[in-house]
């Protein structure tokens, strides 16, 4: 009996040892598998960044013993699909997002919180662009803002003030064919709120109070904003009627400029390639000083690196984002794409290249204001655009147009965001 009991104990001990060994083996295999999975990162980007990422990823892969897989596609489509991709487990680890999408996606739980590395050398404007309710959801990569393009064959130097633009408008060589008394000397797409905001802000208007975070305080009908709208109306009295058509005005402006009929226009850096292709002998400068002596305070824009909440390795993704926003990699981004780096040290490098467009954007960005990145901003665009059209067309005076726009924005926010 004793022998049988000892034998049973021995067998039990042996079985336990075998099970433990199997368990340890399974655990080891599982850990090995997890480690293997954690050593791969997927980055989703527009095709225009593919060469840049492939050129710079090797050092990161070597230093971190990781493989960076590059997938290309339309960035906005990728962001639109992020909710489903996060849920299904198919979200990439790193993406690029326009600043105006970062805050809302973060507040919706689609983006992971990030830490801005000291090496990213961000400034107050770019930091604000990736921050929502005190939380950082992206790391600034690229900056953009509106600038002044001018035709060097028509004017010898960039106009410095709006008073100079007004003088150009008196020159008969800029008379618009088909509409007596109308000029194309200077053109701006001011029925598009993105383009108009710099004028309004330069006079003291604003979208939301508390640096764009308080949707209960809308500053588009204050005294400064109304004065700006009244000034815009003086230009619409000079411009062809087609400038009032928000669906066709941008095309009209660019056609007049590329055909050599407009001396100066307000546009973004993304238009430079098409002007070059059209053979325009253009220059680029900061937007002229407003009649009140202040700067045109356009929206600051651009793109940030973000990490979806569905990332399988957020820690390594954060590390890759830090790598991409470091000074050396931001210099490489500029060299590869000519897009202006958010990193302030890399910006200095970009300026040293003596490129007119780069210098103008960086100088203008100093006066730029962060576009509010709270979700309520989506309720602003249509009413604010209507505000300028109604004032420009004479349907309403400036004060009424502004007051009505603020009411429309307030009502829509209440409807969409009421608790």
Set out the residue ranges of the language-model regions:
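Conserved N-terminal structural module of periplasmic/extracytoplasmic solute-binding proteins
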Residues: 2-15, 23-101, 291-293, 316, ...
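A structural signal for short loop-to-beta-strand junctions that line the ligand-binding cleft
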Residues: 85, 92-93, 119-153, 184-188, ...
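Hinge/lid segment of periplasmic solute-binding proteins
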Residues: 99-146, 157, 162-166, 177-180, ...
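Extracytoplasmic/periplasmic solute-binding protein
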Residues: 137-141, 146, 166-218, 262
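Extracytoplasmic/periplasmic substrate-recognition and gating elements
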Residues: 156, 237, 276-338
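Glycine-centered hinge/linker elements that transmit conformational signals in sensory
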Residues: 215-246
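Conserved C-terminal helix/tail region of periplasmic/extracytoplasmic solute-binding proteins
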Residues: 366-419
């Amino acid at each position: 009996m004793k022998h049988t009991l000892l034998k049973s104990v021995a067998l039990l001990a042996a079985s336990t040892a075998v099970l433990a060994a199997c368990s340890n083996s399974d655990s080891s295999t599982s850990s090995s598998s997890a480690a293997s999975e954690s050593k791969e990162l997927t980055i989703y980007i527009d095709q225009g960044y593919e060469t840049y990422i492939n050129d710079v990823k090797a050092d990161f892969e070597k230093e971190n013993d990781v493989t960076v897989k590059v997938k290309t596609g339309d960035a906005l489509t990728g962001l639109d699909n992020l909710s489903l991709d996060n849920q299904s487990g198919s979200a990439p680890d790193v993406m690029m997002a326009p600043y105006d999408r970062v805050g809302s996606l973060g507040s919706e739980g689609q983006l992971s919180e990030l830490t801005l590395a000291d090496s990213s050398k961000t400034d107050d404007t770019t930091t604000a662009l990736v921050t929502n309710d005190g939380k950082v959801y992206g790391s600034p990569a690229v900056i953009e803002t509106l600038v002044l393009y001018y035709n060097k064959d028509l004017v010898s130097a960039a106009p410095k003030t709006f008073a100079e633009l007004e003088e150009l408008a008196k020159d008969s060589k800029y008379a618009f064919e088909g509409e007596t008394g109308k000029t194309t000397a200077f053109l701006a797409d001011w029925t598009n709120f993105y383009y108009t905001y710099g004028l309004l802000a330069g006079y003291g208007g604003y979208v939301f109070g508390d640096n764009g975070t308080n949707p209960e305080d809308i500053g588009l009908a204050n005294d400064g904003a109304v004065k700006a709208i009244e000034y815009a109306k003086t230009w619409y009295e000079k411009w062809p009627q087609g400038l009032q058509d928000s669906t066709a005005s941008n095309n009209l402006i660019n056609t007049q400029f590329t055909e050599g009929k407009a001396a100066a226009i307000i546009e973004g850096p993304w238009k430079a390639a098409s002007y070059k292709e059209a053979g325009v002998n253009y220059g680029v400068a900061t937007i002229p000083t407003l009649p009140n002596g202040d700067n045109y305070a356009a929206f600051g824009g651009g793109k940030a690196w973000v990490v979806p909440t569905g990332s399988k390795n957020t820690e390594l993704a954060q590390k890759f984002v830090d790598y991409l926003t470091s000074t050396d990699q931001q210099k490489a981004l500029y060299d590869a794409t000519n897009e202006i780096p958010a990193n302030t040290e890399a910006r200095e490098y970009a300026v040293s290249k003596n490129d007119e467009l780069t210098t103008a954007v960086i100088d203008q960005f100093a006066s730029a204001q962060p576009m509010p990145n709270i979700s309520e901003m989506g309720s602003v665009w249509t009413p604010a655009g209507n505000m300028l059209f109604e004032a420009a067309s004479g349907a309403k005076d400036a004060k009424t147009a502004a007051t009505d726009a603020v009411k429309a924005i307030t009502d829509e926010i209440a409807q969409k965001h009421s608790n």
